[in-house]
Amino acid sequence: ADGTQFLGTEAFDFEESGIDILGASAYKWLLAGYGNGFYLVKDGVMDQFDLKGIGNGSVNNDASKRNSITFCKFLEPGHLDSLNFGSLEFAINFLDEIGLENVQAQLEKLSKRALTAFSELDLLEPAITKRKQHSTIFNIKGNEKLFNKLTKENIVASPRGGGIRLSFHFYNTEEEIDVIATLLKRWSSK
């Protein structure tokens, strides 16, 4: 399973989950920067793999150890990026300090506020407006002209599939969503 779109949004216990292998890029909700990711593999599925490839670092520069290394050593690249490991550790500690229950609560507030605001402005697909719960990623109706206006106002957005993606994380505020909604309303009335 891909945890990129989930990890960092609420508490998650890999061992208690029904997932055997989880991979994730850590740049998104985990806030650990680009080029950072990991895999989690449950002990019970490791014997289903016959991994052959190793890097020099996997065997600590001694190829004679190739048959005695642990499962995870087969998954290591040739050169490990200790700076990225430190960034990931810092990000995980930062989120732990805030508390993932607080992150989740803030995301729920932001999602409700954005869902209401964008629905009232008729900027969402009908299927989205009917949802009781939605993520904090919204694809609003809009063209390149609207995208450029948002960008000019220092609002981070991305053109996506004929619309404009707006995403919010715990560090965003409901007031920021209100500002965006006010601008969108003003621009639509012109």
Regions found by a protein language model. Give the residues of each.
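Conserved PLP-binding catalytic core of the aspartate aminotransferase-like
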Residues: E108-E153, F168
